[in-house]
Amino acid sequence: MLLTGYYNVRKENLMNKELRAVADNIIDAAIKAVLPDEAVKKTLKDRKFDGKVILVAVGKAAWQMAKAASDCLGDRINEGIVITKYGHVKEPIERIECFEAGHPVPDENSFKATQAAIEMVSGLNKNDTVLFLLSGGGSALFEKPKITGEELQDITNQLLACGADIVEINTIRKRLSEVKGGRFAKLCEPAHVLSIVLSDILGDPLDMIASGPACACLLYTSPSP
């Protein structure tokens, strides 16, 4: 009986280890599937482009996404720009200019980098492609305000202080911006815009992730009483 019991304990421990290994593999695969670089590589694999390819990467994962795109496409990328949070640029990327800017409140670097991106996509033709890599944090990092920068910073601080959620904040941001709510895509015309978007908002509303620079603006209003 003692030997049988010992055997059963060993067998149970072995099964637990096997289940743990399976669970670990599932978790590792799930994490790998949502890594920024993996998402970009999967999307760009075997993709062909006509004309110029201009890369614009915006958000807290912008550098990783741009690096993955550069590894995939190499010199097929004519030029590009990364706009990310301070401390998030790991190293230079060939043919791509990297900016670090303010988050969660936009700063002068946000405005300067966004203007550089606008100038980069101007003058393209219908055969060209803007590869737009978007991740969370883009609302503050990517901005050309319709009002003064100081006014926008003040409004952003007030929204954050009062406890507004991300959808409420981005709804207001879109109305004060020259690039949000699909306006950046309009600035890229007649070039084609290929967006790869990493969502950080529940439900994945494309018009709200980084305030939807390449997505048509949807109006959010309170329901009628």
Named regions from a protein language model:
Residues 4-14:
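Short, Lys/Arg-enriched N-terminal segments with co-localized hydrophobic residues
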Residues 15-56, 64-65:
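An N-terminal, well-structured beta->alpha segment
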Residues 52-58, 97-104, 131-143:
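Short glycine-rich or small-residue beta-strand-to-loop segments that form or flank ligand, phosphate
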Residues 57-65, 138, 206-215:
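Conserved phosphate/anionic-ligand binding catalytic regions in large, soluble enzymes, centered on
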Residues 66-88:
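Active-site cofactor/substrate anionic-group-binding motifs, chiefly glycine-
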Residues 85-126, 172-173:
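Glycine-rich oxoanion-binding loops at beta->alpha junctions
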Residues 127-205, 214:
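Glycine-rich, mobile lid/loop segments that gate access to catalytic sites or pores
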Residues 220-225:
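Conserved small/polar residues in nucleotide/adenosyl-binding loops
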